[in-house]
Design a protein with these regions (language model features):
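Short glycine/threonine-rich loop-to-helix capping motif typified by GTGT followed
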Residues: 377, 403-407
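Surface segments flanking catalytic/ligand-binding clefts of nucleic-acid enzymes
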Residues: 419
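Thr-Gly-centered strand-to-loop micro-motif
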Residues: 365-366, 393, 423, 442-443
């Protein structure tokens, strides 16, 4: 009875009921309009034609265009109305304006050191331009004097997260897509946060409204506030049909005193540390920064924190705190964020840069593989140039529809000379790319439309840091545990899942 009561009063149940009622209403209106008269149907045909012409002439990735055109053409009235509904709303302008304003205010604390750029040029001339691109559009300069600790599994990262939290003296910032209040992982972190609040440490926690809809009870932010922890929910779920709720905060950031920062694929729930088995062994990755580059993640957190605030917070004290934690080490680190607020797809460009500038290899680990034409062509071109391109995917998926969709790309990628492997012990949730033993990207960005176009994401680009070799070693170790997929294997995939995957692919950019 208690379980039923909790379900009926949960965020997820209320939101689903309200959304279902709205969907039923829209479907009923659609049926009524479709049968009402030939005049209305004629008008809808004209509207569909106008919208198709409009979409063809938009500056947009071609796969998005084809999806919309197909939807409008096949289902004229519903497709046209859905298109207008989606395009009219776009990304929330309030969030966009707030984010850009705080980002502009923080620029004076994130000035690029030109000596660093000169050193990058001397180290690798091909990466100088890309480093400047990331510095301009990714929201953070390139840094030296930063130590990088790579984690090949969530359990090890969690242990170091706790150790660093216990060292906190001034502030702790947490920003996660998912926090599960019943998990051992969160409860151990929460106990440390409560302890630190009593010691006078400023603690801020931010989580995504959609990501936590089933893992946190209603008004959990108020509970945390009562513990002395400042808390905000990014884009709380409102039971109204709106495309604004499509843009989620998918970032995973932990910053302690400006001295250390953690990032990667790991959320705060027990499956990420293999305390709870859901899809076999959970393979995830992440990293800890210690030193000057931590400032980039501090700034990213504060930019999201200050969205919807009436007054822009002065973030200088927090961002500049990293200067005194400088670590003498080799290489360069560029923290970067990506948002749906512009048409600059930083995460996508970072992955493409690794492919286009590779001379020996590019290795990719991703839980989802839903790529557009440009990404496919870059992978194909790299393989045609003789670059060894390998992709590790899950063998046990968390979302079957996404897995069936990903497998529709296998045949064309294999024919292009790209090697695909599936991690047989379980689920790969790692998001990373490594190239030539020099360049690596680790963070929250999946190889799918949601991450590359729709979500708020973050990662770090690493050039010639010692940890890059750890990343390469981990990839090769994971490869040993993975099954190589061949064209013969693809032929024997279940026919029904293949058909379903290709049907889903028609609307992949909208998922």
């Amino acid at each position: 009875m208690k379980k039923i009561y909790r379900l009926l009063y949960s965020n997820k149940f209320v939101a689903m009921v309200m959304l279902l009622m709205q969907i039923i209403t829209f479907v009923a209106m659609y049926i009524w309009i479709s049968d009402y008269s030939k005049v209305l149907f004629g008008l809808s045909t004209v509207l569909s034609a106008v919208l198709i012409i409009f979409e063809i002439n938009r500056t947009e990735e071609s796969t998005f265009k084809m999806t919309w055109i197909t939807l409008i053409a096949i289902i004229p009235i519903f497709g046209a109305l859905f298109y207008l509904f989606t395009r009219a709303q776009g990304v929330s302008m309030n969030i966009g304006d707030d984010y850009k304003n705080i980002q502009e205010a923080n620029k004076k604390y994130l000035v690029q050191d030109e000596d660093v750029m000169k050193n990058i040029y001397q180290t690798d001339k091909n990466q100088d331009g890309f480093a400047r691109y990331l510095s301009k559009y990714g929201g953070s300069p390139a840094y030296t004097n930063t130590g990088v600790q790579y984690y090949s599994i969530g359990e090890r990262m969690f242990e170091d997260m706790k150790k660093e939290l216990l060292k906190a003296e001034k502030f702790i910032f947490l920003e996660f897509f998912i926090i599960n209040h019943t998990s051992r992982m969160w409860n151990e972190i929460l106990e440390i946060l409560k302890k630190k609040v009593k010691q006078g440490v400023e603690v801020r926690v931010m989580y995504d409204g959609m990501g936590c809809i089933a893992t946190l009870p209603r008004k959990y932010n108020e509970y945390l506030e009562r513990q002395g922890i400042k808390c905000r929910i990014f884009s709380p779920i409102v039971p109204l049909l709106s495309t604004h709720q499509n843009n989620r905060d998918h970032r995973k950031i932990m910053v302690i005193d400006g001295a250390t920062a953690f990032c990667g694929g790991i959320n705060i729930s027990d499956e990420y540390i293999n305390e709870k088995m859901r899809f076999g062994h959970w393979k995830d990755t992440g990293f800890m920064l210690r030193g000057e580059a931590v400032a980039g993640f501090t700034a990213m957190f504060l930019e999201m924190w200050n969205v919807n605030d009436e007054h822009i917070e002065n973030c200088g004290e927090y961002i500049q705190a990293s200067k005194k934690y400088s670590v003498s080490t080799d290489g360069f680190v560029i923290p970067f964020g990506d948002t749906p607020l512009d048409e600059v797809y930083v995460g996508k460009r970072a992955y493409i840069n690794n492919l286009n500038n590779a001379s020996e290899y590019t290795y990719i680990m991703t839980p989802y593989l839903v790529i557009d034409d440009e990404m496919y062509e870059c992978m194909k071109y790299a393989a045609q140039r003789g670059v060894d391109v390998k992709i590790i995917m899950p063998h046990i998926p968390d979302k079957k529809y996404a897995f069936y969709l990903a497998r529709t790309y296998y045949k064309e990628l294999l024919k292009a000379g790209i090697e695909i492997y599936e991690y047989t012990p379980g689920f790969v949730h790692a998001k990373m790319s490594i190239s030539d033993g020099k360049k690596a990207i680790v963070g929250t960005v999946n190889h799918d439309y949601r991450s590359l176009y729709l979500h708020y994401e973050c990662a770090a680009y690493m050039l010639n840091v010692p940890a890059v070799m750890d990343i390469e070693r981990d990839f090769k170790d994971t490869l040993e545990l993975s099954q190589k997929i061949t064209l013969e294997d693809v032929k024997h995939f279940n026919i029904f899942t293949k058909i379903l995957g290709h049907i889903i692919r028609l609307v992949a950019p909208l998922l």
